[in-house]
Each structure stands twice: as C-alpha cells, then as structure tokens.
C-alpha cells in the first residue's frame, strides 16, 4: 500500500480510499437490518483494513453509522482516517449554508462515534452563497477541534482559489483537499443532475477539456480524492468493448448517464489491449492510469470482494509508460 500526507493531518493516508456507499454497508443500517447484515458489513471492513486501506470515504447519508459501530467494536479509531461530507442538497432546498455545515458536522461526529473528523468536505457548492460564509463556518469547526482538515467535493478549482484567497486575507485556515470526479473515463453528463436543482452540479477534472484543472492541482499540491475513479463499474471488466450494450445490465443509471459514450468505449478497448499485453485486469490498467498522473492524488473505489481489494492494491505498482498513458486517454 502507498500512503501520502496532507497538511494538517499527522496520520498517513492510504492512496486507495474505500468508498462506503456500497450495498453491504447500506444493508447493515437499513430499518430491517439483521445481526447477520452487520456481521457482513464488519467482515468487509475488516478485509479492507487488514489490506492496508486505512482511509474511508463517508457522507451524511452513507457510511457514517456503520463506520462508527465498526470502529467502536474494533477499537481502531486512531488507526483510521475518516473523510466525510456534509451540506448536500435535499429535495426542498440548497444546504450550503453556515447552519447546515455546522449541523451536519455535529451529526456526523455522533454517528461516527468520534470527537474529531480527519477530513471534512462539503458535498456540493453553491455559487449563490458568498465564499466567506463557508470559509468562516469551516474555520469555526476547525477552531472547536471538530475537524482536522477540510475542503470541497464537487467544487471548481476557481471557487477553491476564491475560498483560499479569502482565508489568507482573513488569517484563516484554507482548503487543503478536494474531491472532484477523476479517472480515465470522461464524465460526459452529470450523473446526479437532479441534485443540482438547488446547488451547483457535479465537478469533474477528467477528459481533454479539463487539462487546466489538472494542471492547477499539480501546481498547488492540493490533494485530489478522486471519486468514481473506475467510472461506477465501467472498467470493472464485467462487460467488454465488443459488447458495450452489456453495460446496461451491469451499471446503474448514474453510471450510464455519466460515462456511457463512444469515447469511453474506445478507452475501454485500449485498456483491454494493455491488460492482455501485461497479463493484468482491465480495472488495474484504469487505476494504474490514475496513479500515473502528476498530482497529489488518492482514488476512491468500493471493491466488494477480497480479490477486488487486492487487485486494486496491485494496480498501484503497475507502471505505465508516458506513451501508454497518453494512448489510453485517446491522445495519439
């Protein structure tokens, strides 16, 4: 396992981050959950943790409650890095407000059964809200000792820049992390467009049009926590570029909406070619491509079997040449 450091956090952070929005973990906190459901969730988390993955991605509406129970049962909170998110819109309104930021963070602390969140992110942004209000609210949580570091998920780099300029001007702590979509697959449509009814849409830094975004991250050193790094199963190997229509049987609606397009099918075809040449799996090639980028970067994924977990870890050691990296991304 490879680890990195981020400013403000003493713990090592695994470059593979386990995404907790996965069926076994949802089942464990469902109203009809059984003891067996909890045991299955704990077993998955045990396997992830024993493999060296110590960083877990949660949010106000997934992962927190079961993570809190598991860490309490295993007495390993100090060994885990918890990334969680708040201020996601609901069906009625935008929730990127100082009230909701503070409220969600305090709720998260209770569900996680902890007194401090390692990495706290806002799940969405809203340009209707002055950035100063947001920075002040996050700094209040920081000064109260409730969060160690913070940033934004689905924030543009320009908005992060604005936030950090405000922080510098007012002697406050800046954003040090960001979680946009990033991976080999180009995100061609907002997978959760309904969520953008009140807040800003999802943010991706994938594809040729986002080169300036990636350059900014490389230059600033702000760590990227890349969500949907394998495009919600597009590079799972469960379907091939020869029969791409099989994706409709494998992927959910968000995955199809976000990633099913001719250019990504071609990227999949090229992954398949390299996977055969190197004797590895398609998902490993796609992950290796991510880790070949010139950014401080961690990749979020939600493997559900021991084999998938260790395949992902092995992908970190798979080296791609400069030409292979370009070729996979359709830069011929």
Question: Model-found features: residue ranges?
Answer:
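N-terminal binding-site loop/beta-alpha segment at the start of enzyme catalytic domains
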Residues: 1-80, 143
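Active-site mouth loops of central-metabolism enzymes
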Residues: 23-39, 86-100, 123, 127-128
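Short, acidic/polar
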Residues: 33-47, 96-112, 161-165
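Short catalytic-loop micro-motif centered on adjacent basic/acidic residues
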Residues: 54-59, 121-122, 148-153, 179
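Acidic-and-aromatic substrate-binding clefts and catalytic sites of carbohydrate-active enzymes
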Residues: 57-66, 89-95, 125-130, 157-160, ...
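A short, structured active-site edge motif that brings together acidic residues
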Residues: 78-92, 178-182
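Active-site groove signature of glycoside hydrolases
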Residues: 109-130
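Beta/alpha (TIM)-barrel catalytic core signal, keyed to glycine-rich beta->alpha loops juxtaposed to Asp/Glu
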Residues: 130-332
């Amino acid at each position: 396992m490879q680890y990195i450091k981020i400013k403000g956090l003493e713990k090592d952070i695994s470059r593979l981050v386990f995404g907790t929005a996965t069926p076994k973990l949802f089942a464990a906190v469902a109203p009809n959950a059984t003891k067996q459901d909890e045991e299955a969730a704990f077993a998955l988390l045990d396997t992830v943790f024993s493999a060296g993955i110590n960083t877990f991605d949660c949010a106000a509406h997934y992962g927190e409650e079961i993570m809190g129970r598991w860490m309490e049962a295993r007495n390993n909170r100090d060994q885990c890095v918890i990334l969680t998110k708040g201020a996601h819109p609901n069906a009625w309104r935008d929730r990127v407000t100082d009230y909701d930021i503070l409220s969600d963070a305090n709720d998260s602390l209770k569900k996680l059964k902890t007194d401090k969140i390692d990495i706290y992110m806002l799940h969405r942004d809203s340009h209707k809200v002055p950035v100063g209000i947001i920075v002040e609210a996050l700094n209040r949580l920081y000064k109260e000792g409730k969060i160690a570091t913070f940033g934004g998920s689905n924030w543009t780099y320009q908005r992060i820049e604005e936030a950090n300029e405000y922080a510098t001007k007012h002697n406050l702590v800046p954003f040090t992390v960001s979680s946009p979509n990033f991976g080999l697959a180009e995100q061609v449509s907002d997978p959760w467009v309904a969520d953008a009814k009140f807040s800003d849409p999802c943010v991706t830094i994938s594809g040729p049009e986002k080169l300036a975004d990636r350059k900014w991250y490389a230059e600033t050193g702000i760590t990227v926590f890349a969500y949907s790094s394998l495009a919600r199963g597009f590079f799972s190997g469960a379907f091939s570029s020869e029969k791409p229509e099989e994706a409709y049987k494998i992927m959910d609606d968000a995955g199809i909406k976000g990633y099913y397009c001719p250019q990504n099918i071609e990227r999949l075809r090229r992954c398949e070619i390299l996977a055969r040449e190197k004797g590895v799996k398609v998902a490993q090639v796609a992950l290796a491509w991510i880790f070949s980028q010139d950014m401080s970067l961690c990749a979020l994924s939600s493997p559900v079997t021991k084999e998938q977990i260790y395949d992902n870890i092995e992908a970190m050691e798979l080296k791609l040449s400069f030409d292979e990296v370009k070729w996979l991304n359709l830069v011929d």
